[in-house]
């Protein structure tokens, strides 16, 4: 059986110079983020908020002094009841003290549980659809051990200047405020009021509305009118310097506001162009920045890596890879959030891929291929591991830099090659704007559904292999060129690194044919081992081939083996021309008469049959009006052996098929 062969002309040579520093920094980013999140993700960490209500709105009023690790204030929640109930349950650390809970002005009874929940009791049963609000007044020192460690941090910077910041992914929000802390509910909007000593500035989500003086303190007000997950809410307070500017994106002007340690202000200002260019680039590919009606911002904090707080990424430095990675999360992680930590690649794989896109398109295309090669070497440095997270209780597994970040990003590279740019980006935009997903939660199945809709392809095999499956293939390509017709024959086989998980990877494998400066790339759609392919004469004598030289697929230890006399004796053969024409011969092998079917041809065509010594045995010349033609070749008087049937179209392109008697 033969498969379709696609020919693509290429006219450039790839550089081989490596730039390991960027590769190392990208891996270090993933590892530092893993360490950042490690403290807040343990086997016992989970949201225990009740499922009988959803939160519509939060109004958070907090008192913060960055010199003291302490919080007091209130959180008012507007909610809608989904199941008749007389109580609702919030997530809240048992270490914080709840002073009172009020339904408007009425005090409600409540109880704090050892499992870090706050149970609120109503005097009557609330019916489904009932919308109401409660205010929780509380105070205390947030826990800093176990799975809450690192979620509410007080430290210093510069000349011993106090700074306080939060980082709540994945379950750290409940350490410092009452909320629904799971991946099943987003508040439609939020207002945040932070009262702090007047010598400091506060940073948080959304638009900075006002700074109201209150004697020795100031109340900073932020408002955010987009749906937001609890773990994406963040605050920081210190003596920030503020850098504000406007970034033009098409017909929109998006404010960029940065809160930076004074000692680092110049560095951030000198690198703001990176954020500006990335905002414009990502908007051109994935649609306008998701929170364009408000702003984007960066806040400096003192933890390794960064955190994609919605509209306001917390970053530890003004480095290109970190800033572009966290910005990418605003589309992938914030606008559309993974609905399970098993699908963390929908956040981290995408953000890693976007940072790679920025580098190759805006910084330096010369070093992009060595960077891809470095990523590939890192991914295949171990034989196993899936992008799908099979153990969400392990922080090392959830935030695995090799699998969730790098292999996740490479999965997108493979999808882009498999689908083509048009269908790939169309599908990603559909995913981001899917009414069921936009400003909500998504699964890998949701991404697959939108990519299939955009491309018309069934991608079950792809996600079964590359998302759920472990490992990678090693390809062996045997090849030879016919000295008479010039056509090139291939036999492709593969071995997989974890055959018990994936015994064969179906791929559209690029093969580059080369002879000095002459190069053509063909794509072999590999569906099974030892599959045979025939390629029409590429127009030059092929000296060598390269297997997936641009690294569109994860693979390792590939081998190309030249066999000049490679011949086939398979039963059914198709060989498209440059325009996609096909020759089908049946039966094959033949005894008396062979039926030849031409498809996707038009205009004048010529068919010639040659025996194994190159002698012409039969010919046909005529016009094709309906893009297909069927005719018969009498083989009764021909000697046993192999024959070449060569099709020449009106534009001069040729295809050929082998017929065996």
Task: List where the protein language model places each region.
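Hydrophobic helix-coil surface modules that form long, contiguous segments used
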Residues: 73, 166-169, 180-324, 353
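Amphipathic alpha-helical substructures
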Residues: 401-490
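C-terminal outer-membrane/trafficking sorting elements
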Residues: 576-586, 590-661
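Zinc-dependent metallopeptidase catalytic helix centered on the HExxH motif
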Residues: 313-370
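Acidic/His/Gly-enriched intrinsically disordered linker/tail segments
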Residues: 348-410, 414-418, 437-438
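N-terminal, polar/Ser/Thr-rich
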Residues: 18-72, 157-162, 459-461, 465
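A surface-exposed beta-strand-loop module
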Residues: 20-29, 88, 93-156, 530-539, ...
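Glycine/proline-rich low-complexity spacer/linker segments in large multi-domain proteins
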Residues: 45-50, 128, 137-190, 551-571, ...
